[in-house]
Amino acid sequence: MTTADARTPASKQNDGTPDGTTPDAGTPNDGAGKSIGWHKGYVQGSRPDLRVPVRQVHLTNGKHVTLYDTSGPYTDASVDTDVRRGLAPLRENWIIARGDTEEYAGRPVRPEDDGLKHTSPRGGLRNLDAVFPGRPRQPRRSRDGRPVTQLAYARRGEVTPEMEYVAIRENVEAEVVREEIAAGRAVLPANVNHPEIEPMIIGKRFLVKVNANIGNSAVTSSIEEEVDKMTWATQWGADTVMDLSTGRNIHTTREWVLRNSPVPIGTVPLYQALEKVDGRAEELTWEIYKDTVIEQAEQGVDYMTVHAGVRLPYVPLTARRKTGIVSRGGSIMAAWCLAHHKESFLYEHFEELCEILATYDVTYSLGDGLRPGSIADANDEAQFAELRTLGELNTVAKRFGVQTMIEGPGHVPMHKIKENIDLQQEICEEAPFYTLGPLTTDVAPAYDHITSGIGAAMIAWWGTAMLCYVTPKEHLGLPNRDDVKTGVITYKIAAHAADLAKGHPGAQEWDDALSDARFEFRWEDQFNLALDPDTAREFHDETLPAEPAKTAHFCSMCGPKFCSMKISQDIRRQHGGSREEIEEGMAEKSKEFAAAGNRVYLPIAD
């Protein structure tokens, strides 16, 4: 099996198989019936088709730890997955049962949707067919024009199956989930056209989430690579994935990704719209953008980054910046505003856009197109002017029943980070904050996963709900498979550190389980409990490869004579004992003190 996510809302150390969970068919054992390693299990909900996946880590002391899992069916040995078929539509019956949506023909797929001219042959797909060959489907939308969003249901007092699902994942009551969504403090991205997802929630009362970016460009990558990167990212713990493709076959790539993704998929519709006008920002129109949004909503995109806060009056505020406008979406909209000397069409048509998103339950991710791209530009007038507009737009979106989160910076030194979260929470009425890092210094190309991981841990501790990962390739190139893993693991560390600092239920039990395994030299348990078991085992075996080293009471760093934990254990054995023995020893020393005349200091004998 491939290692899956290891964050936990309900990290439990129990004997045997936990109550309420069922193992998959591939549960490993030691030959004597005792489970070892880890396996995919499920927690049963209130209905037969509501089974929440968990990762069960079986310890060598007979206990187990239950961890949050994002890997989907790919790590369930009992499920036969095939990317050409796609995943099973987990939520389909829930959506149909609500009775407020309908199937319809949808818009036809056009050559320009894939960045192709009418006369161009379809090609460049390398190893995958041009059209997704899985089960045929028609798009679904609201039946009567009313919002079919989780926000609308929550406001009506309904606890949907999706809400129950995430409540089990987060180890909280379902009513807590409903209340947070209804108040706009959390979002549950779940397009009615993406029934394959395992529902998750983004909000500061819940586990800090991590997003991984994938996507092709005009110079590199293929559909097959992007599908592989998506499944790879989720197996290492990505809670959502954004497809930021800007090259050929954008529509087709997205279809393959959506049909195979167990997590919500986000996009930036502006990128595809720009491809439809051959990269000329000034030729963009509201009609082209609107059509692109509907195209993506029909496919099943769960959340969309919309740069509606980049307004004409704010563009001059960036003139004195060291690095100007670094957001792709922000620069596109700034160029359009200047070319036409008009207010942004995204801002002008925002209410109409709300109506479209509410029809499919697409969540807004209001983009920070004027985010700082260098430490020198952090927290400037342009950044905060846009933030105030995002606060206004958040209010409008909620009025239309659209779930909304707010995107944040960027490059921010540590002493300026807290101001960002404080202002966002105040201006945006505690809507979930979704930040890229922030990067805390500009001097480390090739190590920006570290510079940003520092800022990510800090801002998540103070309330950011989701972190957008940064890979070692940031500012340098398109990330490959290894870069994706490094980015996800780095940000999972930041997210879990924040969960610990916030006191999230169950967070520390995972750390305690690993600490116990470390102190007791249970090496296999340490590996299996680690965020990255494969690398932990690999590093250990580089210097102590022999199998007996897996049970040795030392590692290669200190060796057998200088291992601090072994010395601590020896002290316990030699000088420890029961409470009664300790108290008897203290009493004996008290008698010796009295017999010596109750003197604190005794003369040194010659």
From Swiss-Prot:
One of its GO terms (biological process) is thiamine biosynthetic process. Keywords: 4Fe-4S, Iron, Iron-sulfur, Lyase, Metal-binding, S-adenosyl-L-methionine, Thiamine biosynthesis, Zinc. It catalyses: 5-amino-1-(5-phospho-beta-D-ribosyl)imidazole + S-adenosyl-L-methionine = 4-amino-2-methyl-5-(phosphooxymethyl)pyrimidine + CO + 5'-deoxyadenosine + formate + L-methionine + 3 H(+). Residues 1-49, 105-147 are annotated as: Disordered. Zn(2+) binds at residues 411, 475. Signal peptide: none annotated. Binds 1 [4Fe-4S] cluster per subunit. The cluster is coordinated with 3 cysteines and an exchangeable S-adenosyl-L-methionine. Belongs to the ThiC family. Catalyzes the synthesis of the hydroxymethylpyrimidine phosphate (HMP-P) moiety of thiamine from aminoimidazole ribotide (AIR) in a radical S-adenosyl-L-methionine (SAM)-dependent reaction. [4Fe-4S] cluster binds at residues 555, 558, 563. InterPro entries: ThiC, ThiC-associated_dom, ThiC/Bza_core_dom, ThiC/BzaA/B. Its EC number is 4.1.99.17. Residues 105-117 have a biased composition (Basic and acidic residues). This is Phosphomethylpyrimidine synthase. Substrate binds at residues 213, 242, 271, 307, 327-329, 368-371, 407, 434. HAMAP family: ThiC. Residues 14-31 have a biased composition (Low complexity). NCBIfam families: PRK09284.1, PRK13352.1, thiC. Its cofactor is [4Fe-4S] cluster. Pathway: Cofactor biosynthesis; thiamine diphosphate biosynthesis. Residues 1-13 have a biased composition (Polar residues). GO terms for molecular function: 4 iron, 4 sulfur cluster binding; carbon-carbon lyase activity; zinc ion binding. GO terms for cellular component: cytosol. It is an enzyme of class 4 (lyase).
